[in-house]
């Protein structure tokens, strides 16, 4: 896969320190699926030599544009957020393994906190397009950090929790999961490690008793499927997308390795999407 030039179409601050950017990059948009990411690098002489990964938040094949969500708190993020329409960068993508939705799933539960919404946003569009029902649970510290509902399709049921109670429910977004898990055929999460570990623990305690795992069972259990395969992930109640920094995106630098249930796994190649049971959450 070769890097493609991308031109900024629009950039706007949607939350304090968080920018939504729309890039014209038809070569990257083509074939992009929810959960995948793009690698961004400067085209300027003397610019940042290392690429940074950004989840593909939306992708429109008709216009050839995609959106990413940029936090301006880091040097790279501040540099990228300062771009103006017409500016260009190198994009490499789509990269990584996407979410796998079981064809039988009609009810999808999405769980996000803070910038983690970017890792799930394209899944919202894909699910609505395919006629599925979506509940999005979103958590933030306060109302100032809540993802704007105007950026979501009207068909989505959007439920917010804030730590200070200034908007929606008071508390953590993880507190809301128990209210909706029985409704869901599958669930998908993106956010800080503490949130992912919490929802993974909930899913582990109910494995085989919720969602698509309970559908179409045959005596004898059917044929086994390999852990980490698309088929195995489609049967999982919970999939997560990890937000580790990805250096080479080719699996060679090993800078994004995390501990899996069966040994080390590379976020850039085996992920960034995993079935929750594939990862070692330290729950023993």
Q: Over which residues does each language-model region extend?
A:
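Ferredoxin-reductase
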Residues: 1-85
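Structural signal for conserved beta-strand scaffold positions within catalytic alpha/beta enzyme cores
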Residues: 10, 58, 160-162, 240-242, ...
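Short, surface-exposed secondary-structure boundary micro-motifs
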Residues: 43-45, 94, 261
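Short, Lys/Arg- and Gly-enriched loop/turn segments at beta-strand edges
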Residues: 46-54, 96-104, 268
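FNR/FR-type flavoprotein reductase catalytic core
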Residues: 75-243
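Local cysteine-cluster metal-coordination motifs and their immediate loop/turn environment
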Residues: 119, 242-272
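Short microdomains enriched in Cys/His and/or Lys/Arg
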Residues: 269-284
């Amino acid at each position: 896969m070769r890097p493609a030039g991308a031109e900024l179409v629009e950039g706007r601050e949607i939350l304090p320190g968080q920018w939504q950017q729309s890039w014209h990059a038809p070569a990257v948009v083509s074939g992009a699926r929810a959960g995948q990411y793009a690698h961004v690098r400067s085209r300027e002489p003397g610019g940042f030599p290392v690429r940074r990964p950004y989840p593909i938040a939306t992708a429109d094949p008709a216009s050839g544009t995609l959106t990413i969500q940029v936090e301006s708190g880091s040097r790279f993020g501040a540099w990228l957020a300062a771009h103006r329409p017409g500016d260009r960068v190198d994009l490499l993508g789509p990269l990584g393994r996407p979410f796998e939705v079981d064809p039988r799933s009609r009810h999808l539960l999405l769980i996000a906190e803070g910038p983690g919404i970017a890792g799930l946003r394209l899944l919202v569009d894909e699910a609505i397009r395919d006629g599925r029902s979506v509940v999005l649970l979103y958590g933030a510290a306060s109302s100032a950090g809540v993802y704007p509902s105007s950026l979501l399709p009207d068909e989505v049921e959007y439920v917010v929790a804030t730590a200070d109670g200034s908007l929606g429910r008071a508390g953590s977004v993880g507190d809301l999961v128990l209210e909706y898990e029985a409704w869901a055929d599958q669930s998908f999460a993106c956010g800080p490690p503490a949130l992912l570990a919490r929802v993974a623990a909930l899913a582990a305690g109910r494995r085989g008793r919720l969602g698509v795992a309970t559908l179409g069972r045959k005596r004898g259990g059917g044929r086994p499927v390999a852990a980490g395969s698309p088929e195995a992930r489609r049967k999982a109640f919970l999939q997560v997308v990890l937000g580790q920094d990805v250096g080479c995106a080719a699996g060679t630098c090993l800078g994004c390795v995390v501990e899996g249930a069966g040994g080390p796994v590379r976020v850039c190649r085996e992920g960034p999407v995993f079935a929750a049971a594939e990862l070692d959450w330290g729950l023993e």
